[in-house]
Amino acid sequence: MRILFAAAECAPMIKVGGMGDVVGSLPPALKKLGHDVRLIIPGYGKLWTLMDIAPEPIFRSNTMGVDFSVFETKHPSNGLPIYLVGHPCFDSERIYGGEDEDWRFTFFASAVSEFAWNSWKPQVLHCHDWHTGMIPVWMHQDPEISTVFTIHNLKYQGPWRWKLDQITWCPWYMHGDHTMASAMLYADRVNAVSPTYSREIRTSEYGEKLEGLLNYISGKLRGILNGVDLDEWNPATDNSLPAKFSVDNISGRAINKRVLQERMGLEVNPDKYLMGMVGRLVDQKGIDLLLQVANRLLSYTDSQVVVLGTGDRYLESSLWQLAIEYPGRFSVFLTYDDALSRLIYGGADAFLMPSRFEPCGISQLLAMRYGAIPIVRKVGGLVDTVEPYNPMNETGSGFCFDRYEPIDFYTSLVRSWEAYRHQKSWKELQLRAMSNKYSWDRSAKEYELMYKDVCGIKEPSPDAAEVEKFSYGQEADPSRKGKKIKL
């Protein structure tokens, strides 16, 4: 199939949130399945120096009364074709924000539609979040192009209808209060980035006032879990780590822990329980819960905490104050540093994600991949990826709590601290967590089924021998015929 991804981000060149990871990693996984996958993103200013871009545009047109050009380049990691929408409104280093944000992305969506109609015509146009929300609206009456719309974060919904009427042409049939709502109405298929989140957003607690619409379109709504690039995020080959390690030999984690303690100004002690946190410092990520329990946690236990990220100024200031009050035990680094984030994943004993809501979450997957045990709230994709630890039967991959309350979070922290004191069981917990492999290959197969469904392509029924071969992972064995498979 011919598949065109339209998005505001694409890792590693342009990345602000999880959407960038998805758009950078899912297309090559789909390519391995035999599809012709290409991407189209805004031609941001810094891309012209980062990438080798053809000097002449491959397409020129006019939309919303504005001329634009489309240039072609290649993804630096996987070589997939990338189309850049060139216009002065994208020339600055800024990706989001600014008074013209609504106009910029509405213009981008319109330019993508013109390109898909008149240049490279896909069978499936896969749109991501509100920035591309007008594409399904404009494509609604084109029977040759099917649209898929992915909800990465329902909280961000785009410009309202009255503003859209002022900046562009809205079809007479368009309904919906804003870009996100309109996209969900007119896309042929809609998906959220985890099964649990796809159910949560149909409730008033997580629906962001769109739960009624989401229940209305539930027949075309599904949840597909994000994955991780297992080659890029591999502790056995990660050159950012002082000591590499694998699930077969995790002794290198002790060296990484020592280096992490030294770099973050903590007491260097291998026996101290070290918890890490990486991400945006905003309310969604549960920073307020950490602030409420930190004093009690550091008074009751001998734990250490490291935090890496930027965000809300008040939260940054509060975390900095804790670092001043607890030198050698609480450390905060108010920036984003990829190498340091990998050191936290590969050196911390546990990883904190007490999220208020979490559409999918990538950090908990990376933490488990690197042997840091996640401590998470049972919400969104965290439910789908972290199995609660059960010390009685030695199962699970992390510590989970239900309510968004300080006491619940604190209880999980103390439980994990106590579990860490039993090193044999803790190491087994680490090995179970590291054995989880949430790859993009598995996610790509689910997206492929959705694409085929929306295009009316039916899967052929395999013969019995193929089914048996798939079930057992080997050539069909007549001696096993009729035996039950343990799932």
UniProtKB/Swiss-Prot annotation:
A Pfam family recorded for this sequence: Glycos_transf_1
Single GO MF descriptor: alpha-1,4-glucan glucosyltransferase (ADP-glucose donor) activity
UniProt pathway annotation: Glycan biosynthesis; glycogen biosynthesis
Catalytic activity: [(1->4)-alpha-D-glucosyl](n) + ADP-alpha-D-glucose = [(1->4)-alpha-D-glucosyl](n+1) + ADP + H(+)
Alphabetical list of InterPro entries matching this protein: Glyco_trans_1 (IPR001296), GS/SS (IPR011835), Starch_synth_cat_dom (IPR013534)
Binding residues annotated for ADP-alpha-D-glucose, in chain numbering: 15
Region (Disordered): 468-487
EC number of this enzyme: 2.4.1.21
Keyword terms of this UniProt record: Glycogen biosynthesis, Glycosyltransferase, Transferase
Entry's Gene Ontology BP terms: glycogen biosynthetic process
HAMAP family for the chain: Glycogen_synth
Family: Belongs to the glycosyltransferase 1 family. Bacterial/plant glycogen synthase subfamily.
Function: Synthesizes alpha-1,4-glucan chains using ADP-glucose.
Protein name: Glycogen synthase
Lineage per the UniProt record: Bacteria, Bacillati, Cyanobacteriota, Cyanophyceae, Synechococcales
Gene from which the chain derives: glgA
